[in-house]
From Swiss-Prot:
Listed GO MF terms: RNA binding; tRNA pseudouridine(55) synthase activity
Stated family: Belongs to the pseudouridine synthase TruB family. Type 1 subfamily.
Stored Pfam families: TruB_N (PF01509)
Keyword tRNA processing found: yes
Organism, as annotated: Sulfurovum sp. (strain NBC37-1)
Name of this protein: tRNA pseudouridine synthase B
Catalysed reaction, written as an equation: uridine(55) in tRNA = pseudouridine(55) in tRNA
UniProtKB keywords: Isomerase, tRNA processing
Residues the record marks as active site: D38 (nucleophile)
GO annotation, biological process: mRNA pseudouridine synthesis; tRNA pseudouridine synthesis
Amino acid sequence: MNRLFVVNKPIFRTSNGYMGYVKRKYNTKKVGFSGTLDPFATGCLIVATGQYTKLFQYLNKTPKSYKATLWLGANSPSLDIEKVDSIREVAPFSQKTIEEVLQSFKGELTYYPPRFSAKKVNGKRAYELAREGKEIDLKQITSTIYEITLINYNHPFIHFEATVSEGTYIRSLGALIADRLRVDATLSSLHRIHEGQFHYENEKALDPFTHLAIPSNIYTGDEAYLELGKKLSVDYFEAKENGIYLIETSNFFSIIEIVGEAVKYRFNRIPKFEDTP
C-alpha cells in the first residue's frame, strides 16, 4: 500500500512509537514519518507508507506553524513539562512587554538546540547523552521566525503562535523568550498546526504529486525507457538545465536529476495516487 497522509499525534507518545499504531491500523509494514514531534507535543505529523516513504525530502514541508504555551516560573532541563524540577512564583508582566519580547524574535535566529533533542553528536542522539549525564557539544543552528503572535497571556502562562522554518526547535524559542524576560520558564504544551501544505484532515489520503516541492519536466522519448530504468538522454527533456525534476508518465511518476549531459534516476516508477478508502 502506498499512502501519504497526516496524523494527529497524541500527547506523551513518541513519533516513532506512534508508527506502531499506524502499521496496525493500515495493516502495512513499511511506514515512515517526517518532522519528529517531541513526546509532549501533539498535532500534524506527515506519514507515508510503501514507496511513498521515499518522498519525504522532496515534499513541500515549510514553513511550519505551532501553538505553544510557555509556563513562567517553571524550570526543566528538557525545556518541556516532562522533566520539571522546580516551580517559582514570578511577578506578572504587562501584555505590552510580552508582545514586544515576542516580536523581537522575528527574523533569523541563531541558537543552540536543546540538550534533550534528536540531534546526533558523535553518532549518538543528544537526548541519550543528556540522560547519561554526559557533556554535549552541540553546534549552533540558524532558523527563521516568520511570524510570532501572542494569543493570550493568563499569568503565569503565555500562549503564542509561531510560524517558522523547517528544523526550528520551539522549546529553544521558549527558553530564549524566558531569558529575554529574565525568568525561568518551560513549554507546558506544544501543538503543530501544519507543515507547509500539510495539515490534519482525518488521515485523508493525499496525492503526493501535488505536494512535491520540485519542478515538473516533460520527457518526450519512449516511456518504456523510463519504465525499464534505461539510460536517458538529456535531449529528450523539455527542460535541460541542471536540477532535480518530476516526470509524469501515464502509469507512474519518477524523480530524475540532470547534471550536465547526464540524467540520473533519483527514484523511478513511483506508483500514481489512487483515491481509494
